[in-house]
Amino acid sequence: FGYMKTDYNVRIYYRNEQWGALEVCSEETIPMHMAATCLHYGQEAFEGLKAFRGKDGKVRIFRLEENAARLQSTCRGILMPELPTERFKEAILKVVKLNERFIPPYESGASLYIRPLLIGTGAQVGVHPAKEYLFVVFVTPVGPYFKGGFSTNPYVIIREFDRAAPLG
């Protein structure tokens, strides 16, 4: 894994208790207040998914709705506004389409890594949820996860013992 610049990222700002319009951006940096809650209180969530080019040339995105649901679950846990599933899907589909030229060919075994990120950008000192957030999605091509192919390992799972429990 590594970062390689692509053409575009997409962003949706949350202000005044509502999500704004989807914005297309080519800038790689995010202007941020030094008291942003993501910096001081960890008010941040991210997902990771991939787009693959099939043998037929069609682009397929792995587990899109499941990633949206997991991000929403994280948001509930750390008091961030949930991005609706349809908005999540809209952002992912848009950024993949805009950067389609970076999706590796089927034969390579590689993919386009998709990183959705939601951060608290509102300035806040004290443990309180931010009033402003940024949802941003960027992509980068990545090689196969198992470079030498997938092979099994001779490990045994022992279910009777747990290192963190008595007798473990």
Residue ranges and their predicted role:
Residues 1-168:
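Conserved alpha/beta cores of soluble small-molecule-handling proteins
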